[in-house]
Amino acid sequence: MTSANDKSTDTNVDSTQAEQKMAEKQNKLLSGIIERATKSGIGRKKLNPSAVESAVAKNMAEIHNNPTKLRLVVLGGGSFGTAMANLAARNGCDTTLWVRNKRTVKAMAKSQMNKKYLPGYKLDDRLKYSHELQAAVKDTDIIFIAVPGLAFRETLKSIAPFISGQSIVSLTKGMEKDTFALMSDIIKEELPEVNFGVMSGPNLAIEIMKNMPSATVIASESEPLRHAVQAALHSAFFRVFASDDIRGVELGGALKNIYAIAMGMAAAYEVGENTKAMILTRGLAEMSRFGVHAGANPLTFLGLSGVGDLYATCSSELSRNYRIGNMLGRGMTIDAAVKKLGQTAEGVNTIQQVHEKATKEGIYMPITHALHAVIYEDKAALGVALHLMEAGFRSDVEFVMEHDHSNASLTAQMQTANNQAKNEKTKPDNK
């Protein structure tokens, strides 16, 4: 005879087992979606957009048949690359961090720490490490590239023989020296068949490692890739937003470094809040002006990858470009400042590239030109700043609808509505 307690126990066991099975089913479904989302059927063979869409649809339809968790590799063991690899591993992704130096890999695996760039921050136990490029890249779904801009093209060439359907996401901010190419341009040149995206935002690596709430933007023309990156990195402390404006998101991440250097220099002179606000907002104006000229959506610069990244980089002493600017403001040469920093500050190269491009194309970039004069032409910073303040009159806000056009449009709409109302009144009564 079965007691009431026995029946209650059996019911609880059955309920627990059912919940476990449901959770397993949901996990399998999600992991399958993630993998299929990153597989758009693009290998070394060049496909047209409709074929890619068909491949994505086919893969999504097969999500129940071959579920597996997302497999990632992050190329580059700097602070941000390490932080992203750690975040993905913590989210349960099969994640490998590739670092070129074998000795560094052994040290990181042993200590579970990146002592050079993130000392004192323990990395997730599940994170794997490798110095062998082929082994790290093979059989992955997404390749995140977090190497300095100077090494970006060479890295793509190195992994080209091992690409067999993986998607690529650039974490590198800046422009290639001498070519003015953004990282997305380099991807299209070196691996034209690959599905790709770029990620950028106000992402100071140390704050991410401290679990301070942060957010970023993944930009790609591939919606499945955007969703996959969100699934891989999104957490209670790190939110991933999506965009399809690759140009705007990438330019925001590259151009803001210029104004971080300017803000660092200003801080060295102990300027007031008015001056800081002026540099920040006029820097944003330059970013959006340059971005629109390059084909970006000006509204993108009002988001995380624009004003968000600009604010974080310009207001934090953790920013490498801010620190470079601060050292320059205290009288150090650019070479000495870069050497003391010990890390790559992409803004130094970006200033030169944007100055040349803006001069050639006639884009109004006064702060950029002023920084170029100080860093590369050995001009006195205070003299250049005074010249900036004495520049001619300009409008404040750009990229808004002209008032005449706006009023004319509104007047036309009101007139149309008025005419329709009159017509309704003059219609004969059919009652």
Swiss-Prot record:
The gene is gpsA. Its main location: cytoplasm. Pathway: Membrane lipid metabolism; glycerophospholipid metabolism. Sn-glycerol 3-phosphate binds at K173, G201, K256, D309, S319, R320, N321. GO terms for cellular component: cytosol. It comes from Psychrobacter arcticus (strain DSM 17307 / VKM B-2377 / 273-4). Keywords: Cytoplasm, Lipid biosynthesis, Lipid metabolism, NAD, NADP, Nucleotide-binding, Oxidoreductase, Phospholipid biosynthesis, Phospholipid metabolism. It is an enzyme of class 1 (oxidoreductase). Belongs to the NAD-dependent glycerol-3-phosphate dehydrogenase family. Signal peptide: none annotated. GO terms for biological process: carbohydrate metabolic process; glycerol-3-phosphate biosynthetic process; glycerol-3-phosphate catabolic process; glycerophospholipid biosynthetic process. PANTHER family: GLYCEROL-3-PHOSPHATE DEHYDROGENASE (PTHR11728), GLYCEROL-3-PHOSPHATE DEHYDROGENASE [NAD(+)] 2, CHLOROPLASTIC (PTHR11728:SF1). This is Glycerol-3-phosphate dehydrogenase [NAD(P)+].
